[in-house]
């Protein structure tokens, strides 16, 4: 539209073929992400297929009256075919769908600059735990951890996450060098990323008089949140 304002749009499509498929639960390893213990001696074959596609829109404003910014929105789908006979595509662990980023700086008088970066990430899919199976004493003792309910693989979705970072710079131009000082505050809103809750074994058996194959541990839910406000200051010298 002008010399300082630019827009662009890009689409993409990628097809995956002959990816490892678990013979234990008939789920493609590539769709499990990093939380499912996909490394090891699990039996697999190369029959999984998938796809990733989407659209990215970008706007750039170049140094007009001291303001520069880049904003982008991405819609992305990442899916693999269900290997359990349905033939339907199911979301992979990377299927966040909506991604928005904005970063901008504004030049103030007397060599001051202020900048901001905003990120909004859509919630990733996840697989619920099979709490009923996990609470069985024999099942928990066999694995030492929770079991996923693969019949509901990636059927739930985490909440979106938003993070705002702020930075203020001051530059001093001296005779023989340039001195820059800055204050940077990451996650100034102190946003918390809500992860999938887990359950821990308390050690208490709820029904100790029942047959061993029916005994259950008491499991306690534990909420998981990450993210903290992180301020920092710094100096930069250029000769």
Residue ranges and their predicted role:
Residues 12-15, 34-128:
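Gram-negative outer-membrane beta-barrel transporters
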Residues 31-40, 76-85, 141-150, 210-216:
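Flexible, solvent-exposed coil segments and beta strand-coil junctions
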Residues 1, 55-61, 71, 102-106, ...:
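Residues on the lipid-exposed face of transmembrane beta-strands in outer-membrane beta-barrel proteins
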Residues 20-26, 33, 76, 80-88, ...:
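Outer-membrane beta-barrel translocator domains and adjoining extracellular loop/strand segments
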Residues 1-40:
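Membrane-embedded beta-barrel scaffold of Gram-negative outer-membrane proteins
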Residues 4-7, 66-69, 111-114, 175-179:
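Repeated loop/turn-to-beta-strand initiation elements of outer-membrane beta-barrel proteins
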Residues 119-143, 159-163, 170-239:
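C-terminal beta-signal and adjacent terminal beta-strands/loops
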Residues 1-3, 49-53, 96-100, 160-164, ...:
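Residues that define the transmembrane beta-barrel architecture of outer-membrane proteins
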